[in-house]
Amino acid sequence: MPRFKTYRKLLEQIHGPSSQLTPVDQVQFYAKMQDIYSCFYVVIQTLEITLRNKIHQAKIKHYNNENWYENFKAEPHCTFNAKRIINAALDKVDKDFKSKSINYESQDVLARITFGLWPEILKATYREKLFWQIYGSEVFPNKGKVKLSQIDDNLLKIGKLRNRLYHYEPLWKTTKNFKNFNELRSVVDEYFEIIMTLIKHCSLEKYELMKQMKQPEQFKTKMDDLFLFLSKTP
């Protein structure tokens, strides 16, 4: 089990090599890490849906077209990757609705567009265009003085994180080494904070909802629980 070996390696890194680490310790550590990962699902899904809907509404206004992705795809600054993502969504919706004998709507296409399109729309070549000058404050009404380039960088990070999460892979690069628990916590904490900040940039309402649902508290509690487990492991 290659993935389990990754967690065993991590446990040895942050705990220190010990002949007293048992298979039970390793399984419990793996389970606690998965429990921590579960905290990311709600916030990532909230970010994805909120950002998707914000861009969708702004693009409809910009092109005066519900099927704005067709206009965007035809623009010279639309990247190859953006076209690939849009075409994949269109192919999928065609396939899904082919046997239903009903027409699909823009929302059906939108639901099949993957997270990777949103950083593409924030690429430097596109940030210079009129869209972000007019609609930037509608998509990210609470970003303050944060630059779109920084938001783009963070979306790219979270996109990679999302892919690892949904493929049951470690949230960090497997080549990364940690000297102790604090280093691991710093990395995982940063990911969670980035997601919460991006949600806040898009919608204060959704940000407050995450707090009301105690998502940050649950995450902190599970990280504290992992620390307690490690401190008790021989």
Predicted regions and their residues:
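Extended intrinsically disordered or low-complexity regions, especially N/C-terminal cytosolic tails and loops
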Residues: M1-D153, K157, W172-P234
